């Protein structure tokens, strides 16, 4: 059986309720149906803490050995689902995490840009088929979402790694 790991994030400054956290609970209810398709579903809620990103992803890699790693993160200013196509070696040094800490000034390792290892166009089309607006994006931001996507692309042995930004749910 192959392993699909899906992650969301906990609350952070500016988002006291993160819809991707509740998405993980909803997905877990479908684990048996997904297993009938030959996939073991594992969900995780990641903390929005700069210093915990890489260690948590290494633990997921070691313990779960995902074949597909799919991250969801909240993008408060976007009005549609955004399938990220690349992550950049940058962090916004002015944005605090859930512990109200700023990122390390050394930032992320090089290379400057890492490209997604998943078919963004197919993922956009799948989201659009549900009736939700979706598009691909070349900017995963400068916060923990970009850091997570960058670290996953760098550390994961998964054949496919993807990141989807979710708009606010009203």
PLM segments and residue spans:
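Active-site-adjacent mobile loop/cap segments within catalytic or ligand-binding domains
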Residues: 147-170
């Amino acid at each position: 059986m192959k392993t699909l790991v899906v992650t969301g994030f906990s609350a952070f400054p500016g988002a006291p309720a993160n819809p991707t956290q509740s998405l993980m609970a909803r997905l877990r209810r479908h684990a048996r149906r997904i297993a009938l398709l030959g996939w073991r579903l594992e969900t995780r809620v990641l903390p929005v803490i700069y210093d915990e990103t890489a260690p948590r992803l290494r633990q997921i890699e070691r313990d779960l050995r995902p074949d597909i790693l799919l991250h969801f993160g909240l993008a408060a200013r976007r009005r549609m689902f955004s399938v990220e196509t690349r992550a950049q070696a940058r962090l916004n040094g002015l944005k605090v995490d859930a512990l109200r800490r700023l990122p390390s000034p050394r930032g992320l390792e090089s290379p400057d840009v890492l490209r997604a290892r998943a078919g963004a166009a197919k993922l956009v089309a799948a989201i659009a088929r549900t009736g939700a607006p979706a598009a691909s994006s070349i900017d995963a931001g400068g916060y923990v979402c970009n850091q997570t996507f960058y670290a996953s692309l760098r550390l994961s042995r998964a054949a496919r790694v993807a990141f989807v930004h979710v708009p606010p749910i009203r």
